[in-house]
Curated annotation (Swiss-Prot):
It is an enzyme of class 5 (isomerase). This is Chaperonin GroEL. ATP binds at residues 29-32, 86-90, 413, 495. The lineage of its organism: Bacteria, Bacillati, Bacillota, Clostridia, Thermoanaerobacterales. One of its GO terms (molecular function) is ATP-dependent protein folding chaperone. GO terms for biological process: protein refolding.
Length: 540
């Protein structure tokens, strides 16, 4: 396919136009007085949102050269969202300011490679400064604060704080759409996986259609159970000791299933069988997780165990097991806390090493199930549009809160970036030439968020920036919602350090890329072929 190419100044100008198209659309949403943006949907009602990354993702430009600039800026927003879950608008704004400042300097003859290195040094100093002023988050009240600010709703803040308190910081918190108007929190203690009973005859509560086993023993195997002969020695021990049994196997069918059901109906012993969760290698890992959690062993021929030789001390134990048509929940597994801790650390190490987002998500689910349980926030609203918007806000707030627990918090409203200006100024003073110019680009960008928040609230940004700088108080800032200066930490206007740090690093990374671009190559658009048939008759 033929290509079109633009070089040098012309290429960078096209990128600049693309950057401006995205940034000017996104930055109007920054701060508590930020405006909304309406996104057209081909089907259904338009989406009204003030979430930076949602808006950025929708933007595609007609000009292919300008579109490259737009896509690069979207990368800064998306990457920030993936890592920190928030801060997308800040990242977009910072990147725009750095690109515009950098291009001015390039036009004046600066060397792009030296600018890039100067910017990197300045960002390094700013990140160190952020870590220095960061305050750790450790109590429920401050967690609720962070969540309430991100979601702009105190009730949601409380729900998220409660969820984190119940399942721990490594626990999984999922957000689902509710059938009702209210928003509620449901916490599933222990380990839950998406497999229900194999036969409905196994239920203990016919009204709720669920099976509840108190103090059961748990057989965990990767085998398919079809012959009753394999199970008989174990079942005899179960009856002898009057135990209740949960079987987690690859499958239970035929004569083995019939025997279990008949004995359950006769009241000989209580038993529930479920299929093992997951597939392939992931299934083996999950069975091992369940074994460690319950203090049992995986009965597998790979490990040299035969079902006929299984004794009660090889089975797992739990305080309670609840099985519905779709889920199995194991509460109060009797595993050794040391072994569980080792397994948790092993999964954490795998999360660090993996490069696949899907694998990371699945590993985090496994980690949560071992580390404390699952909390589900059921989101309700009066209309479909409101429901989508509310769910979005809660997901954002959840990610921001997790980031705050991880790396602590800094004063919000863009004040943290103003606070690290002194750290960056020291770097600027120590550099010369184009290195210095590069560091100054970052220095100027650090003022942009406060300026934009003020301007979105209808106030002169420059005056606000100067007043905050003059105060010499690290927590002093402008509350755009109440339109007054205040102590940001006391007022509860805070940002997770991770969000601010990630936004700055990603913005500088994308800006450096654009500034060091010397050519853009895009496809030549295909001319649409005319479908009108030729007039007249063919020659015979």
């Amino acid at each position: 396919m033929a290509k079109q190419i633009k070089y040098g100044e012309e290429a960078r100008k096209a990128l600049e136009r693309g950057v401006n198209a995205v940034a000017n659309t996104v930055k109007v949403t920054l701060g508590p007085r930020g405006r909304n943006v309406v996104l057209d949907k081909k089907y259904g009602t338009p989406t009204v949102t003030n979430d930076g990354v949602t808006i950025a993702r929708e933007i595609e430009l007609e000009d292919p050269f300008e579109n490259q600039g737009a896509q690069l800026l979207k990368e800064a927003a998306t990457k920030t969202n993936d890592v920190a879950g928030d801060g997308t608008t800040t990242a977009t704004l910072l990147a725009q300011v750095m690109v515009l400042e950098g291009l001015k300097n390039l036009a004046a003859g600066a060397n792009p490679m030296l600018l890039r290195r100067g910017m990197a040094k300045a960002v390094e100093a700013a990140v160190e400064g952020l870590r220095r002023i960061s305050k750790p988050i450790d109590n429920k009240e401050s967690i609720a604060h962070v969540a309430a600010i991100s979601a702009a709703d105190e009730e949601i803040g409380q729900l998220i704080a409660e969820a984190m308190e119940k399942v721990g910081k490594d626990g999984v918190i999922t957000v689902e759409e509710s059938k009702t108007i209210g928003t509620t929190l449901e916490v599933v203690e222990g380990m839950q996986f998406d497999r229900g009973y194999i036969s409905p005859y196994m239920v203990t509560d016919a009204e709720k259609m669920e099976a509840v086993l108190e103090e059961p023993v748990i057989l965990i195997t990767d085998k398919k159970l079809s012959s009753v002969q394999d199970l008989l020695p174990l079942l005899e021990q179960i009856v002898q000791h009057g135990k209740k049994l949960l079987i987690i196997a690859d499958d239970v069918e035929g004569e083995a299933l019939a025997t279990l059901v008949v004995n359950k109906l006769r009241g000989t012993f209580s038993c529930v069988a479920v299929k093992a969760p997951g597939f392939g290698d992931r299934r083996k890992e999950m069975l091992q997780d369940i074994a460690i959690l319950t203090g049992g062993q995986v009965i597998s021929e790979e490990l040299g165990y035969d079902l006929k030789d299984v004794t009660l001390d090889m089975l797992g134990r739990a305080r309670q097991v609840k099985v519905t048509k779709e889920h199995t929940t194991i509460v109060g597994g009797a595993g050794n806390p040391e072994d569980i801790k080792k397994r948790i650390n092993q999964i954490k190490a795998q999360i660090e090493e993996t490069t696949s987002d899907y694998d990371r998500e699945k590993l985090q689910e496994r980690l949560a199930k071992l580390a404390g349980g699952v909390a589900v926030i059921q989101v309700g609203a009066a209309t479909e549009t409101e429901l989508k918007e509310k769910k979005h806000r809660i997901e954002d707030a959840l990610a921001a809160t997790k980031a705050a627990v991880e790396e602590g918090i800094v004063p919000g409203g863009g004040v943290a970036l103003l606070n690290v200006i002194e750290d960056v100024q020291k770097v600027v003073d120590s550099l010369e030439g184009d290195f210095k110019t590069g560091a100054k680009i970052v220095l100027k960008a650090l003022e942009a968020p406060v300026r934009q928040i003020a301007e979105n609230a209808g106030v002169d940004g420059s005056i606000i920036v100067e007043k905050i700088k003059a105060a010499k108080d690290p927590n002093f800032g402008y509350d755009a919602y109440r339109e007054e200066f205040t102590d940001m930490i006391k007022r509860g206007i805070i940002d997770p350090t991770k969000v601010t740090r990630t936004a700055l690093q990603n913005a500088a990374s994308i800006a450096s890329m654009i500034l060091t671009t010397e050519a853009i190559v895009v496809d030549v658009p295909e001319k649409e072929k005319s479908n009108i048939p030729g007039a007249g008759m063919d020659m015979m």
